[in-house]
Amino acid sequence: MGTGDFICISMTGGAPWGFRLQGGKEEQQPLQVAKIRSQSKASGSGLREGDEVVSINGNPCADLTYPEVIKLMEGITDSLHLLVKRPSSGTSETLDSESETTNHQHLTHEGPMESTTLQIQQATETQSEDFFLAPVQTKVPLTEDQSNAWGYAECPKEEQAPPMLGSQEGHLVEEVILRQKAEAGQPGHVVELQLSLSKERHQCTSGPIVTLQGNDKSTSPDPDWSSQLERTVHINSIPAPEKADTSLTSSTSSGRELRVIQGRDPGGAGLPQVEVILDCSDRLKAEECRLQTGRGCVASPVEGGRSEAPPSLVSFAVSSEGTEHGEDQRSGKDQSRPHKHRARHARLRRSESLSEKQVKEAKSKCKSIALLLTDAPNPNSKGVLMFKKRRRRARKYTLVSYGTGELEREEEEEEDQEAGDKDEISEVAFLGTSESEVDEELLSDVDDNTQVVNFDWDSGLVDIEKRLNRGDKMEMLPDTTGKGALMFAKRRERMEQFTAQNEEEKTGGMAGGGPDALQTDGLRTMTSYQRKEESVRMQSSVSESSFQMGRSLASVPQQNGFSGVSETAGAQRMFPMNRTAKPFLGSMNQPAAPFSPTRSVTSPISDFPAPPPYSAVSPPPEAFSRGVSSPVAGPAQPPPWPQPAPWSQPAFYDSSEQIASRDERIAVPAKRTGILQEAKRRGTTKPMFTFKETKVSPNPELLSLLQNAEGKRGTGGDSGPEEDYLSLGAEACNFMQSSAKQKTPPPVAPKPAVKSPSSSQPVAPVSPVWSPGVAPAQRPAFSTSNPPNPPQVTAVSSIKIAQPAAPPARPASALNLAGPFKGPQAVVVSHNYTPKPSAPTPLVNAAPAGAGGPSNELPGMSGKGAQLFAKRQSRMEKYVVDSDTVQAHTVRAQSPTPSLPASWKYSSNVRAPPPVAYNPIHSPSYPLAAIKSQPPGAQASKTSKKKGKKPLNTLDVMKHQPYQLNASLFTFQPPDSKDGLPQKSTVKVSSAPAMKQALPPRQANVGSPTNAQASSVYSVPAYTSQPNFFAAEATSPVSASPVPVSVPTSPKQESTSTSYFVAPRPKFSAKKSGVTVQVWKPSVVEE
C-alpha cells in the first residue's frame, strides 16, 4: 500500500448512507468511494470521494468483489464503520484540530483525578510495520451534545484491536489525539494528547514526543484551565526487554501530569504507555453531583469495531499529517442521534437530517430558557413574573369543563393540562423545565410504570402529587375533575338508554316520560329538536328561547299534557307557521333576547292557539310590545323558566327525549339547525348599517309590523316571526321570512313596487320624487294626530318620507297607483311595503314620526344605526334619516343624495336629471314651494308641469334657498298634496293654475282633499288651496320628522315659495325638514 492516512468513519441511523463505491476484486482495483451525496450521512461524517475502503464493520474488503460488498452493505442496518485510506497527498480531514478545540466544552470529572491511559501496541517482527492502538483503561465523563444526559462510563480493558496496515515507506507518524469534553453548564476546554512515534521506535533510536495541549481560548471561570500552556515532552522510548517499567513523568503548569510508561504486554513486546493525569478544580468537583451514570460504546478507530468504552470522549486516528481525528461515538442510549466530537458545529452532523438538527437546537434553546425561568437570577424580573402570570392564567382556563365534551376528550385535556402545568419533572431531581429531555422521555414512555414526582414551582410543594401511568389518570383525577367525569358518565348512560327512543322519535314517535330525568338534569337549555326534520326546522321556539327548569313539577305536568298525540299534531300544525327561522320561539311573545323568559307568550293560556298568532308575521300590538314586558306571560307562572316549559318542546316531546337530544347535540353538532350560528356569523360581518336587527327587512309583513299596531294586526296575528326578525337582524330576518309562511310573499327585489301610504295617491306615478327628508316636528305632531290613519303611520315609519298617508278609503287605489311610483320610492325606503295599505313603510325613523306604538316597540330601529345607514347610502334600500341627520346634510348642500337611492344622482345645479320632456330651468321655482309645503307640492307638481316654467327668476332662489335656507328632502308627494298647499294669496294665485293642471292627473285623488283635511296628514286637497297652515299640516305628516316646527312658520315659507312653487312642476315636493337635500323627481306623467 502506498503512503496514506487511515481514518475510521462511523455512520449510524441505517441506510441510505449517501455514498457510492466502485472497484472490487473482480476489477483488480481497490474499493473506492466513487461519489458522495451532499447533505448525506457520508458527507457529514467526513467521507470523501477517492477514499479507499479498507474494511467495512471489521470485514476486510481487499478480497471482496463488488457484489459481495453491496451485499455486505445491505446487511448493515444500524451503524456502519468504515476504515478508509486517504492518500497522504490529499487534504487533511474535514475537521481541523483548532476548530474542534474551540467548539468543545469544558471537561468535567467524576473525581478530583482522572486517569486516561493509552496503550500503543507493537506488532510482531513479521508485522513490524503495523501498529496496534487500543485504549487500556479510561475513566472519563460521558458527554454528548447539550441535549443529552450527563454521565460517566467506566469500561473494562479493551481487547487487542486487529492489526492496522501501516506504510512501509518513510516514517509513519502516529498521532493519538485524546479529546475529552463534558458539559458542565459553561464553555469548557479540549485536552489534546498528541503522541508522535517514529516508525523505528522499537529500535530505540528515538523516543516518543508527547504534546499536551490546553485550550487557551476557553472561557471557563477556572483560571487554571484558561492559563494552560502547551508543553511538549520528549521521551526516550526504551524497548521492553531493557526497561520494562521505565517511566517518565512530566507535569504541566496546570497541574496535569503526563507520564509515559514503557511496559510489557502479555505477549512480551514492549508497550509504551502514555498516562495523563488531570487535576480538576474545586469548581469542577462540586459539579460532579449533577452527573448521572451511564454506559456507552466506542468504536475502535483502527478497525471500526465496537467495544465498551465512553462514547464521544476519545477519538483515535493515525495520520502522517498529525491532523486526523477519530470519530465520536454515540451513546448506546441515544441510538437515534449521531454525534461527532465537534459538539455544536453549524455543519450537519453525521447521519443527522436538517430537521433533526433544528429540533435539537430548539430543544436546547427551550431548555436554556426554562432554566433561566426556573432559576432566574432575579426572580422579580418582569419576564419571569410575566411568564408565571401567563402560565397561571393558562392553567386557569384549561381546567376540565363540566357538562361539555366527551369522556375521552376530557381525559386528553386533563393529561395535556397536567403535562403542561408541571414544569419540573424528573425521576430523581427536580429539573427546571418541562421541556427537559427527562420530562420528554417520561411523558412519552407510555409503558413506564415508574412513579414520577411532579413539582409545580408556582404553587409549591402543595401541588406535588404522584401519578401512575396514563391509564390510571381518570381514577386519580382530583375531586373537581371527578365531578365532571361523573356528569359525562351519566350523560353517556342516558344516551345509551334513549338510543332506541331517539330512533322512534326520528320516525315521528313521541316518547313520553323521563320527567324525573329532566328534573335531575336541572338547569338545561331546551335546545333539543325533534329528530324529524320538521321538528328541527320547527321553531326551537320553546326550547331555545329560555333555559327550561325541568325541576318545577308544575312544568312537568304541562309537558305531559302536551305530550298527548293530539297536541303533537297541533304542534306539527304549528310548525309550518313557526317555520320562520326564529332563534327562540319558546314563548309566543318572547323578545329577541334568547333568554328573556318574562314574556312567555302573549298568553300561555291556549298553548296551541298562541302559536298561530306567533307564526303570523305581524304580531298584535301587544305581542309587539312583548319586548318591553311579558304582558300575557305575566299570568303564566312567575318564574320565567316554567312558562317557557309549556311551550318548550316538552309540550311536544318527552323530557327524556329532550335530555337525549341535548346529549346528542353535544356529541353530534350536525343535528343543530344552525340558525343561531348563522345569525351570529352574519352579525360578525357588520353590515354597513348597525340597526339592532330588523331595521331592513323586505318582508311586507315585517313592514306592517313596524308601522303600527294596527298594521301589525292587519298583517296577521303572529308576532313571533317579527320578533325573531328583530332579534336576528336584517339578513337573518330575510332568511327567516322566506322560510316562514307569510300571507303575502315578500317581494324579492329591494325595489319592488309595494303598496305604501304614499301610493294611496294615484298621481304618485306622475311624480316619483324621492324625499328622504325629515320633516320638522310640526309634521310629526300632525302625524301623531293622524296615527288613526294607518297609512299616515306608515308614511312616518318609512324613511320619514314626506309621503302623505292616503286616507283609509284610498289606500287600495293609492297603493296600486303608487306601485309604479313606489318602485323607486321603495328603493328609498328600502323596505318592501306590504301590499296592505295599512303599514306600507316600516322605517326605523317612522316610529318617531308619530307611530308611537312602533317606535316604542322597535326602539332599536331609530338612532345612530339609522343615521349611519343613511350616511353610508346603503345599497339596500332601507335607510332612516333623522331630523338631526337632515340638519347635518344642510351644511353640505352639494350631496343630499346620501339619503336617496344610489340610482338618483343629485346635482347642486340641477336637482335631478330632467325627466322626459322636462325642463329643469322651469322647475327650479317649484322646488322652493315644494320645500315649504309638501302636500301642496303634489298639486304644484302637476301645475308646475305647465306653470312651473313661468317663474324663471325663481331659479336662483331655488338654488340657494333649498339648500341653505331650508333644509329639505324631497319626498314623493302625489300632485294631490300640492292642491292642499295654497297658503296665501300669492300662493293661491300660483296654486290655482297648479290645481288646474294637477287635477286631471289627480282625479283619482279627488276624494283625497277631504281626507287630507280630515287627516291633516299629507292629504291632498286637489281642488282648492287650503290654508297655509293646513297645507303645512299636510306636509308635516309626510315628513314625519321628529323635530316639531311651528305650523305658521311653514305656511309663511310655503307662501313665499308657493308663488314660484305653484309654477314649477309639482314633481318636486320639498319638506321643511330643514334639510338642504332636495331631489328633483321626474314626473312620470307630463302634460
From Swiss-Prot:
Principal place of residence: nucleus
Interaction with FLNC as annotated region, ranges: 803-1087
Renumbered ranges of motif PPPY motif: 611-614
Region (Disordered): 24-52, 88-112, 207-272, 320-359, 581-817, 832-863, 930-952, 970-1012, 1037-1060
PDZ domain ranges (all copies): 6-88
UniProt-annotated stretches for the region F-actin binding: 656-796
One Gene Ontology molecular-function label: muscle alpha-actinin binding
Biased amino acid composition, Polar residues: 207-230, 246-255, 781-797
The protein's name in its UniProt record: Synaptopodin-2
Biological source species: Mus musculus (Mouse)
